[in-house]
Amino acid sequence: MDDRGPDVAPAVVTTADEIAAMEIRGAATIADAAAEALAIQAERSDAERPDAFERQLRAAAKTLYETRPTAVSLPNALRYVLAGMDGETVAELRASTIARAEEFQRDLAQAQSKLGSVGANRLRDGDVVMTHCHSTDALACLEAAVEDGTEIEAIVKETRPRLQGHITARQLREWDVPVTVIVDGAARRYLDQADHVLVGADSIAADGSVINKIGTSGLAVIARERGVPVTVAAQTIKLHPDTMTGHTVEIERRDEREVLDDDERAAITDTADGADDGLTVENPAFDVTPPRYVDAIVTEHGQFPPETVVTLMRELFGETVDEPWEL
C-alpha cells in the first residue's frame, strides 16, 4: 500500500501527498481535506477489533500530520476528529468518527462565512485593499463586502515563487473587483494607494505573532511605516495551542527548485550538474510577523487585538494539548 503504514488507506496517502505537494493548499482547505481523509479511513477500515481500528485511525492521522509542519489547522482538525472517536465496537467507532468529521466540516464552512462578515465590517466604499498570497479567509472578507454592496479595489502581490497571488486575482475578478497585480518588490510604492492590508495566516502563536507566507512580515513593517492598518483574517483552527506551553513554530523549507530549476541554476553557475557550484538557494515558505505590526485579527468569534488571542486559545483548547496520533 505505502511505506507509511500498511493500515493507512490509499485515499489517505493520496490526500497526504497532495497536501505535501501543495496541490491542496490553504489552511481551511487542508483542514477540510484532513477531516475528510479520516472519515474515509474510518469508512474503509477492515479492522475487526476496536483497538485495531483506533490504531489505524491514529496511523492515518500521523501520515497526514507529517505533511505540513506549519499549517496548524491540520493538527487542529485531526485532534478534533479523533477526540470524537467513541464507542465499544468497531461499528460504533466508525460511526462516531465519520459523524465527527462531518460535524467539523460543517462548522468549518460556517466559520468562514461568519469570519467574512466580521472582516467586511472593516471596509468602506472606495477602499483599496492590498493582499499577499492566497487566503480563503481573507477572500471571505472581501466576498462578504462585495455581497453587501461595498465597492472596493484590490492591489494583489504576485507572491513568489509559486505566484499564489494569481489565484487571489482570479477570484477577485470573478466578483468584478478591479485588481492591480504587482511584483512583490513594488509593495512599498503601491501602499500609498492602499487603505488596508489584508492577509491570512497559516498559524497564530499565543503572543499574537502571525506565521504566514514569506513576505508577510516585510509587508506589515512597511504598512506600519505608511500608516496602513494590517488585518489578519484567520479562523480559530489556525490558532497554535502548542505555543501556550513554550513550543516554537517550525518554519517550513520548500524545494529550492521552486526558486531556481536545474536549467536556471546551471545557467547561473555555468556547470552541468550543479554539484559543488558554490550556490545556495533558500526557500522558506513562511515568516513571523510580530504582533506590534498587526492591528486586528479577525476570526469567526469576532475581532481581537493580537495580544489577546491567548485568552481565546485557552477558551477553545484549554491549557494543554495532546497529540493523539502519538498515543
Swiss-Prot record:
Q: List the disulfide bonds.
A: none
Keywords of the record? Carbohydrate metabolism, Isomerase
Q: Name one GO molecular function term.
A: S-methyl-5-thioribose-1-phosphate isomerase activity
Report the domain of life of the source organism: Archaea
Q: Which reaction does it catalyse?
A: alpha-D-ribose 1,5-bisphosphate = D-ribulose 1,5-bisphosphate
User: Where does this protein hold substrate?
Assistant: R25, G26, A27, A28, R68, N212, K213, K238
The record, for Gene3D superfamilies, names: translation initiation factor eif-2b, domain 1, Translation initiation factor eif-2b, domain 2
Q: Name one GO biological process term.
A: pentose catabolic process
Pfam families in the record:
IF-2B
Q: Sorted alphabetically, which InterPro entries does this protein's record hold?
A: IF-2B-related, IF_2B-like_C, Initiation_fac_2B_a/b/d, M1Pi_N, NagB/RpiA_transferase-like, R15Pi
Keyword match Isomerase:
yes
Annotated catalytic residues = C133, D202
Signal peptide limits? none
Q: Does the keyword Isomerase apply?
A: yes
Report the EC code(s) recorded for this entry.
5.3.1.29
NCBIfam families according to UniProt:
eIF-2B_rel, ribulose_e2b2
Which additional comment does the entry carry?
Reaction proceeds via a cis-phosphoenolate intermediate.
Protein purpose: Isomerase involved in the non-carboxylating pentose bisphosphate pathway, a nucleoside degradation pathway present in some halophilic archaea. Catalyzes the isomerization of ribose 1,5-bisphosphate (R15P) to ribulose 1,5-bisphosphate (RuBP).
**Could you say which protein family the record assigns here?**
Belongs to the eIF-2B alpha/beta/delta subunits family. R15P isomerase subfamily.
What name is this protein filed under? Ribose 1,5-bisphosphate isomerase
Recorded source organism is: Haloterrigena turkmenica (strain ATCC 51198 / DSM 5511 / JCM 9101 / NCIMB 13204 / VKM B-1734 / 4k)
